[in-house]
Amino acid sequence: LDLAARGTVTAVADSLPRDVLLRHDDYDDKFDPHVWMTPDLWMLVVQNVRDALIVARPDSAEVFRANAEAHLAELADLSTYTARILSTVPTESRVLVTAHDAFNYFGAAYGFDVLGIQGISTESEAGLRRISDLVDVLVNRDVQAVFVESSVSDRNIRALIEGAAARGHKVVVGGELFSDAMGEDGSYEGTYVGMIDHNATTIARALGGDASIDGMNGRLNG
């Protein structure tokens, strides 16, 4: 799909400071693209979107500035909430095991060790060795919960749970996270704020933290 042929295209994440971006073993010359996983980084992206829109439509500059200001305030509240509830997860429980490697920015921001079964792309495949190594982590670090993702098959997560069970260690699915897709259109979880609220609340509750099942705004479906 050639988006540039249909109009102006701005890669809004390209202008993020390089010192906040994470490299990944899957890509020698590119950065981990999942910058939306923390509100603080996404606030920088919103500012870039605002500026790009103003350049494209200077006649609507005041509207873009006002909308961005309102959304940035909402993201600031989300950032505060997310940091607060995740800080209640016991240090020894801060191991986040997910279907694919999408949560490295999350881990860096909130002090979690992040382990994805698949690589950074949902199209990559996990080998038996990778699953075996992760079973070792679950057992040795007494990990109690792992997480499926809405956009990735749960097959490998189930294999992890079964592998741990075979070694006498019980692991449960802590919940479903949104990584490369948000919730259903029209739902709270189908918005950026709702997606991050859902992820942070789900992780905190599953790993022993203190968070209301209703989330930041009392709007999560639970």
Short names for language-model regions:
Residues 1-222:
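Extracytoplasmic metal-acquisition and chelation regions
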